[in-house]
Amino acid sequence: MAGEWACLLVSLVLLWGAAGSRDGFLLDRNFCRIKCSFLGSNSMCADRCTVLGASAGHCNNYACFCTDLRDRVKIWGDSVRCRKP
């Protein structure tokens, strides 16, 4: 019985860890990608991603892209550049 509970607990932790983070572009309030267009944008993007709990961040296609973001952060993962609310 204890072995079954331990196995179940490990499975839940692994599933939570896999579902708890993802990669994507940061969005502003209008669901537009946060732009990287100024000198120093790459380091600002990396800093912003780190503050949000991501493992890394960099400018990609002129937008701020974070890796291993938490689910609570709103991101957009495909090629759409801006969506109106």
Curated annotation (Swiss-Prot):
Family, according to the entry, reads as follows: Belongs to the long (4 C-C) scorpion toxin superfamily. Sodium channel inhibitor family.
**Subcellular localization(s) per the UniProt record:** Secreted
**Gene Ontology terms, cellular component aspect?**
extracellular region
Q: What organism is this sequence from?
A: Tityus serrulatus (Brazilian scorpion)
Domain LCN-type CS-alpha/beta residue range list: 22-83
List the GO molecular function terms.
sodium channel inhibitor activity; toxin activity
Read off the InterPro entries from this record: LCN-type_CS_alpha_beta_dom (IPR044062), Scorpion_toxin-like_sf (IPR036574), Scorpion_toxinL/defensin (IPR002061)
Is Secreted one of the keywords UniProt gives this record?
yes
Keyword list (alphabetical) reads:
Disulfide bond, Ion channel impairing toxin, Neurotoxin, Secreted, Signal, Toxin, Voltage-gated sodium channel impairing toxin
Domain commentary: Has the structural arrangement of an alpha-helix connected to antiparallel beta-sheets by disulfide bonds (CS-alpha/beta).
Signal peptide residues are: 1-20
Found, by tissue, as follows: Expressed by the venom gland.
Q: Which cysteines are joined by disulfide bonds?
A: 32-82, 36-59, 45-64, 49-66
Q: What does this protein do?
A: Putative sodium channel toxin.
What residues form the membrane-spanning segments?
none
Q: Per its UniProt record, what Pfam families does this chain match?
A: Toxin_3
Primary residence: secreted
Designated name of the protein: Putative sodium channel toxin Ts37
